[in-house]
Curated annotation (Swiss-Prot):
It comes from Rickettsia bellii (strain RML369-C). Belongs to the UvrC family. InterPro entries: GIY-YIG_endonuc, GIY-YIG_endonuc_sf, GIY-YIG_UvrC_Cho, Hlx-hairpin-Hlx_DNA-bd_motif, RPE4, RuvA_2-like, UVR_dom, UVR_dom_sf. One of its GO terms (cellular component) is cytoplasm. GO terms for biological process: nucleotide-excision repair; SOS response. HAMAP family: UvrC. This is UvrABC system protein C. SUPFAM superfamilies: C-terminal UvrC-binding domain of UvrB, GIY-YIG endonuclease, RuvA domain 2-like. It comes from the Bacteria. Residues 207-242 form the UVR domain. The gene is uvrC. GO terms for molecular function: DNA binding; excinuclease ABC activity. Interacts with UvrB in an incision complex.
Amino acid sequence: MTMELTGNELIKSKLIDIPERSGVYRMFDANKQVIYVGKAKNLKKRLTNYIKTDLDTKTLRMVANTCSLEYSITNSEVEALLLEAQLIKKFQPKFNILLKDDKSFPFIKLRLDHDFPQLLKYRGRALNDGKFFGPFASATEVNTTLSELQKIFKLRSCTDNYFNSRTRPCLQYEIKRCYAPCVGKINKKDYAELVGQVKDFLQGRSKELQENLSKKMEELSEQMRFEEAAEIRDRIKALSYVQLKAGITDIVKDADIIAIVEKNGHYCVEVFLYRIGQACGNIPYFPTSTENSTKEEVLKHFLLQFYQKQQVPPGIIINHEIDDKDNIIEAIRNINDFAKLSITIPASGGKLKLVQNAQENALFSLEQYLKKFAKNQELMFEVKELFNLPEIPERIEVYDNSHIQGKFAVGVMIVAGKSGFDKKEYRVFSLSSRDSITGSSKSTNNDSISCFLDTVDKPRYDTKGDDYEMLRQVLTRRLTRLKQEPHRLPSLMIIDGGKGHLGIVKEVMNKLQMDIPFVCMSKGPDRNAGLEQFHMVGREVFTLNKNLPLMKYLQILRDEAHNFAIKNHRLSRSRAIKVSSLDEIEGIGDTRKKALLHYFGSYKAVSDATLDELSKVKGISKSLAKMIFNALHKN
């Protein structure tokens, strides 16, 4: 039996067949996971570098872990850049420089498919079916802007169903935040004029808008329509205030200002967004796997990964030179199908000041990040020592569940590591129960956490409100998935539970032939915080001093999982209650349920309706209306 070649011996054996062409290569470990993706102008020359003896520590580790190698030939270097960026995004190899937080930026969307359009927050790349303004650096920026615009222009903010169901103005009209087009308090022409003013403001034509409003105010005053003139005056004042807060500049119109800084081998890339001369916020990024990398390498990889997800402005202004700039510009243009793009480094003037400001912000962000990182590193070492782990943990998974006597049961998993919580890795498990509503429990929340129902094919069990059965179900599904995703194996699993839960974890691990360090964390005799007990295989139950930083850290992990479980349980319960409140009424099938929802716009509106209002719905007789009313008000 011959030994399989690995490391530089493997690469040496492949070199004879590798062409001197541009392309992309992929290195795989023993688990057949992609650990590195690279591009090359000349594949043979690039891969020959890996058999040299003077490689840095990171590259030596990478080569030593390489058990197989694949490559793809491309027609050009630009094509190689594009393919490399796509594969890095797909496989997230551990030795590549990675942009972990790649959420798309939010926009403000003005709907164009309704007689009375509304402004909405929108996140995504498909900018169609409306007029879009942005991007903004955070949801907070969008929410603040929407709130200000709502006060100034009073456009509607309700859903179409709610809009169609109104017979009288809602609270938004009473507090002067909406003109109530739903009940005819404003006509289409006047509303369209307001929509035009919103467009002018969001497109940067504030000066012209204020001039037009001033003229209109004078006309209304001359016509003795003083109340309407006062409203226009207040709008002009509010617009001036918002414009002052926005920080309008004539130095740049549409551009991203990007600054990279480095300290102790860690990098921060700060991005400032400017659209129509207005600052739309800034956000710091901390690329990973940057060991032994240069600023130039990190910035280049950042640009290629960042603009796979984000909208590209005509100008990108950076603080550090990059080689191969023309190819990078071409690659970004190809990703976004964008005709015009420049990447520049200012030498003087206002643009240089903007870059310097971005650089100062990046330094501050990096210092804060390093303080947090150092604290987490110290805690990770203490976790290793406390639980006798073979190495400092890279990934900790914490499990909990939530239910009411077995109903609406959900299990959750949260993930933490040296850089804090990794919310993209959070998972929600919808659990089977005879009385609970099951199905997908994909969660959305204010932090835009990326979590989803685990989709492994698995046997379903009836949990019957049994915590142990719920844990068995969650772990069976999770560990089955981990067999397919060994790169996601945790260094430690923490389960909210005690001695009984310990037995369940052992049982599932043995059944699936898995061996992952785990600990069960219970509240202690009186279920008081600070008296937690830890249960491990082969060790006596032990506690920690409640004032230790490590104890506080473990409590934070447990509480994060607990809160996440409760949140998703409430979502599951809310969805189920909405459905069952109508479904349980005799004589209400899908057709009548849809008729009620179409007429009133929401479940709450159905619940709030009077007997007379219910009987006006097509297909609902007076006797059925009475049954519905009594059923919805029985408590």
